[in-house]
Amino acid sequence: LIHSNKYYPFDRSRCEKDLQLTIFDPECFKLAADEILTSHPNIQPILYTRAVAPIMSGNRVTGVYVENREGRGAILAKRVIDATGMSFLLRAAGAECVSTCANAPHRQGPILVFFRAGGISEVTPTYRPNVTDVPYGAINLFPTMRDHEYRIEMTRALGDGSSVEDMTRASIECRRQIPEIIEYLRKNWYGCENIYLIDSGNEALPMSLYKLVGRRPVCVNDMLNGVVPEDTIALCGYGIDVHSAEKGGQNYLHYLELGQ
């Protein structure tokens, strides 16, 4: 990809500068993840199991209650990591968390369903903002590892990501939008004359998430000035993607200068 100018990293239609994503095949990822987990002597994978509540000892989380096909059980641990994506265990344990859409009406934020399409030209423009004819408000295509195949982020609904009712409604609405988006691209977007739907995501993705209130918040000035805290454990090569609670895309783009 890096050495070919017909692919995505050199697509000048993108809103991001010099954007390069780590493209991977989801089926290869599943196999690689299984191999890593099963080859480690101290890891015991347990699939088809959901954590339903934390086990508390005072104000410490010492494990989780789980439910699966065998019923309800408990797993004790020295360390518990909340990887639910919604801070579910953190909130259930009483930790202070705030919604990323706390200031939006009814705590509503964008919810979307990704889908994958084939039959698309390799030289099609992948981004255009302010497209009012589609729910997302923009054309937004991402290439996969296969020629003529793209992952598409163009559905949009609003809701509270912690509400089962909102997530159900948004999932159904976003899936309903997909055939209309496919047809719009076929008729109106260069390179999509032969587009067809391959599949869609099993779950909707809410942008209205909950985050833990830490010892020190990351402020706007920190982000704009590229402040790196002393206790940093990792650096990310991608931007902070801010989605409007009312429409698609970012509200604000700020680029660091070379060397920052």
Which role fits each region the language model picked out?
Residues L47-Y48, R60, E67-R79, A83-Q260:
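Flavin (FAD/FMN)-binding glycine-rich loop and adjacent Rossmann-like elements that form
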Residues L1-T49, A53, G109:
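Conserved N-terminal/central alpha/beta ligand/cofactor-binding core
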Residues D18, C28-K30, I36-S39, Y65, ...:
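Sparse, context-dependent recognition of short Cys/His-centered cofactor- or disulfide-binding micro-motifs
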Residues I55-T62:
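A short, glycine/Asx- and small/polar-enriched loop/turn
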